[in-house]
């Protein structure tokens, strides 16, 4: 690709951005797997606790567990697909964003736009940087925050249910 006036090697920059984008996608997949695990475990514990409440086995303990597991499942579902207000906060979309692509009337016009980026290395670096920034700030970070909330509800629910169970045994 060559270098610009400042000596920036565009090939190295594109490899760096490609590696950064791959790492970000891998982190997002890891969060998705963790969200799926929390959703599954919380759902199982929720179903178990509801059946125990129905059978009148330690209703207070299982009510506490149920409430926390409902909150864990809901926040995990939001982590799987964060709400729009967390994902889109008026950021400038890159040309690689699917809705930006759909705005072009034809594939030929989109191709022309991509070719203009390929002919202008600074514009290509800018688009790559914008895409990485948007994915990180408006996709990965909201998913991570919601996953942590879900995990905290899950752990808190188990801890509170355990404390409630021990308390009911002692008193």
Show which residues each predicted segment covers.
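Short, extreme N-terminal leader segments that mark the start of a protein/domain
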Residues: 1-23
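Solvent-exposed, non-transmembrane helices and loops of integral membrane proteins
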Residues: 2-9, 89-137
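Hydrophobic alpha-helical transmembrane segments and immediately flanking/interface helices
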Residues: 127-154
């Amino acid at each position: 690709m060559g270098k610009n006036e400042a000596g920036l090697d565009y090939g190295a920059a594109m490899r760096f951005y490609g590696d950064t984008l791959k790492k970000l996608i891998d982190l997002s997949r890891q969060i998705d797997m963790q969200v799926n695990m929390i959703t599954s475990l919380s759902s199982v514990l929720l179903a178990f606790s509801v059946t125990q409440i129905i059978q009148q086995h330690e209703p207070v303990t299982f009510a506490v567990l149920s409430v926390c597991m409902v909150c864990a499942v809901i926040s995990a579902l939001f982590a799987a697909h964060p709400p729009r207000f967390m994902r889109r906060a008026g950021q400038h979309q890159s040309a690689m964003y699917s809705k930006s692509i759909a705005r072009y009337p034809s594939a030929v016009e989109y191709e022309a736009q991509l070719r203009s980026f390929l002919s202008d290395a600074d514009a290509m670096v800018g688009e790559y940087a914008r895409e990485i920034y948007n994915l990180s700030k408006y996709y990965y970070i909201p998913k991570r925050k919601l996953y942590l909330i879900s995990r905290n509800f899950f752990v808190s629910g188990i801890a509170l249910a355990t404390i409630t169970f021990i308390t009911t045994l002692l008193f």
